[in-house]
Amino acid sequence: MHRRHFLRAAPLAAIAAPTLVHAKDGVFPATEPHTKRFDEQRWALDNIIQANGIDWDQGHVSVLLRACGLDIQNDMAALRARVKKYADIVPAFEALARKREAMAIEAEKNDEPIPARDNYYTAAAYWATSMWGNEVHGERLRHANDKKRELFTKYIGLADHHIEWVEIPYRGKSVPAVFHLPPNHQAGGKLPVVVMVPGMDGFKERSVSLNGDGWLERGYAVLAIEGPGYWESPVRGIFIDVQGWVETGKEVAKWLRARPEIDMDKVAATGSSFGSFFAAAMISEEPAFKACAVTGTCYDLAGHRIFDEASPTFKKRFMFMSGIADEAEFETFRQTIDWRPFAGKIKAAFLIAGGESDELCPLEATEAFVKALGGPKQLMVYQDSRHSLSGPSAANGPEPRIYQAEWITRRLKGAPMQNERWFVEASGKVDKTAIA
């Protein structure tokens, strides 16, 4: 415990809780995280991956297809053929990244800017994805991060719209982000902006799709951020800190105010999976945010279901994000994963889309969070759907991501809304009831 420091109790004064500890920023664990379930069930995990493939816990392939496009279908087929156990994931993505980088370089030599652009984007996404499953702070992780940034920078130089790297101040350091302006944006024009917080297995470079991105097509600027504990931030020694996300929201607003392109009356946020929790923390004390929409919820207090009942990889990964290698220490730290201190402070309009049968967060936890919100709210529950919001209800009812974008657009235009709970049946029929 010599490398830990105790938090002040004041931010959580409203909630009775044990004394909490956080990792010291900049101090890396000497080993990878170790958990009892992961170590004892590794044989079962590997057999499940062999039987079900790389999507055993979440739809990793579908997310990459949505970001990179159908051109990577053969890559994904090769990935499925290669990945037969957990240890296969990192080298499989590294190999795909090297292949795509070579294709990009060859396309540039042949004066083919579009294939070069597409392959640099895809190679960067593969290098970033190779960081998932690598929970050791070492040269391999740093190399993957460096390659991701190198190749995404090359993509930026060929992209069809303005993109820039961003650093958001954070406690004397900074957390990374990527800023996009929609194609054909004219200097002097004011834009709405969405601040995107990915899930714990997501990253900022993938947050805006290579082609046909829904936010850019709707004329939004996008700031995709990796706050404390997210993807690149742990490489910098910046770990999970709920209050740190609250502080990050204020710094994001300061950064946006300094941008001449941004209409500060039209600022929204989105969150996916664990990003649903951290996006809520981010906006809770910053009035600049007028709306927030999240999918795939993570509101179970202390992450009980995701850490204790789901794939043991989730807990191991979150320990890495928290800068903690010892499971007993993490058991104390996880008590900070609690929305009760900030949910009531949220006055922005809030949309929550969750699955009735979410395996990572019980519906009751999501409903409790919704009840605690301090502003206008809408809850959408997809019948029989799991965490990834798929199946008949998502296919036949309002498509979650499209509805999210249109809902935010209506909120930023000032359209009125009702506090409602929508239950989306498998047929697509929507049953609406009022909520307090």
PLM regions and their residue ranges:
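N-terminal export signals
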Residues: 5-24
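N-terminal cap/lid segment of alpha/beta-hydrolase-fold proteins
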Residues: 93, 146-185
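Cap/lid segment of the alpha/beta-hydrolase catalytic domain
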Residues: 189, 193-259
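Hydrolase active-site cap/lid region
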Residues: 281-329, 348
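Short beta-strand/loop motif that positions the catalytic acidic residue
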Residues: 346, 352-354
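Catalytic histidine neighborhood in serine/cysteine hydrolases
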Residues: 373-388
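Catalytic histidine-centered segment of alpha/beta-hydrolase-like enzymes
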Residues: 385-397
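Catalytic active-site module of serine/aspartate enzymes centered on a nucleophile-bearing elbow/loop
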Residues: 395-436
